[in-house]
Regions:
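Active-site beta-loop-alpha junctions enriched in small/polar residues
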Residues: 83-85, 115, 138-144, 170-174, ...
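Histidine/acidic residue-rich metal-binding segments in metalloenzymes
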Residues: 40-41, 64-69, 95-100, 120-125, ...
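Hydrophobic faces of well-ordered beta-strands that scaffold small-molecule active sites
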Residues: 78-82, 110-112, 136-139, 167-169, ...
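Mid-to-C-terminal alpha-helical segments outside catalytic/metal-binding sites
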Residues: 9, 15, 37-50, 323-357
């Protein structure tokens, strides 16, 4: 193998002395001219290709992810619907980790939801461990809580700290849910044969009215949710939310949303919606219909931002973090024509009044 040599220029001064790299044997004049033109052609082609690449790169714009935003897109907002460990289902983070992540993004508050266990006590612990953020909890009236159980609600709001502010009517155990997904022959009913809210539901709503708790419709059908809203008004409960109104099992029409809003209910929009559908990366989410940002933005424009509340419904193992999901929801809605003022209304003002008003 020949040793590596680096070619250098050879200089000759006016006296004929040489220095630099030894000269190669002189080539014939014709060969020298051919090599010159060959080299020039190759160089010109290379420069042209380089110029083309530079122009192409310029046309493509940035090739790196954008820098972190100077202002957090979720600063001051409230996530009205989070799921954390410990739970019966796989959760990516626990309550404290979720709160810390939200505090780092300058969010205002989080609502801790669990389908099977109380979260009013967990909210107190989060506030103790992560004092920079407000945490709220509540109770979901599924089987483990005794179903539609006013007594469970009474003890929930009495939990130390007073941070148990939300009551979810049946979710996974709801009659509408189990029949829709064929999980069981029947579940916990919220309305009778006459289509009216059952007495047990009315008892729960009376407690919500007395203690200024937020009543959420859970996984009730659209017609059931409207019956619950009517019963809430009769009971004097003016803090009522249609749980993820756009999602599968609930899936209200625009007209039903308008009616619910006219009766004083707020409609929940969640970041999880855009991740669901046949294209979902997690198998369980393929059974729920896809809700696009465009669809949600259309509902906001038609019904009014003052009638909506934002959340994520995130926390599942394998899904985006709750703060990232919330930021995606905000940017997705704004890309569809929703302005920052409307985001503040839905993400801060409306849930703030429900929880702390």
């Amino acid at each position: 193998m020949k040793p590596f040599t680096l070619p250098r220029w050879r200089f000759t001064n006016c006296c004929g002395h040489h220095w630099g790299h030894p000269a190669k044997p002189a080539a014939a004049e014709g060969a020298t001219r051919r090599e010159f033109f060959k080299t020039a052609a190759v160089t010109a082609a290379g420069l042209a290709a380089l110029a083309s690449e530079v122009k192409s790169a310029a046309a493509q714009g940035r090739v790196f992810p954008p820098p972190p935003p100077s202002v957090s897109p979720i600063e001051g907002l409230i996530d009205f619907h989070t799921h954390c460990a410990p739970d019966a289902f796989g959760r990516a983070v626990d309550d404290d980790e979720s709160a810390q992540a939200y505090m780092a993004r300058k969010a205002e508050a989080v609502v801790l939801k669990n389908h099977f266990a109380l979260t009013a006590d967990r909210a107190w612990l989060v506030r103790k461990h992560v004092p920079g953020i407000k945490a709220f909890g509540g109770v979901a009236l599924n089987g483990p809580s005794g179903g539609i159980n006013a007594e469970a609600v009474q003890w929930m709001w009495r939990m130390q700290g007073g941070f148990g502010r939300v009551v979810w009517l049946p979710t996974f155990d709801a009659d509408n849910h189990v029949k829709h997904f064929k999980d069981a022959p029947e579940g916990i009913k919220v309305v009778g044969a006459d289509g009216k809210a059952l007495p047990a539901v009315r008892d729960v709503l009376k407690v919500c009215a007395q203690q200024k708790l937020v009543a959420c419709t859970g996984h009730a059908s659209p017609t059931e949710a409207l019956a619950i809203i009517e019963a809430a008004r009769d009971a004097g409960c003016d803090r009522i939310v249609v749980t993820h109104a756009e999602f599968e099992v609930v899936n209200m029409s625009v007209e039903q949303m308008k009616k619910a809003a006219s009766m004083g209910a707020k409609l929940e929009i969640d970041a999880l919606g855009v991740l669901m559908g046949p294209q979902a990366h997690l198998p369980f989410m393929r059974h729920w219909r896809h809700v696009s940002y465009k669809e949600s933005a259309g509902h906001i424009k038609e019904i009014g931002a003052q009638n909506f509340v934002l959340g994520t419904d995130l926390g599942q193992t394998g899904n985006p973090s709750q703060p990232d999901g919330y930021a995606m929801l905000v940017s997705g809605l704004m890309a569809e024509g929703i302005n920052r003022e409307q985001i503040i209304t839905m993400g801060r003002e409306v849930p703030g009044k429900l929880l702390m008003g």
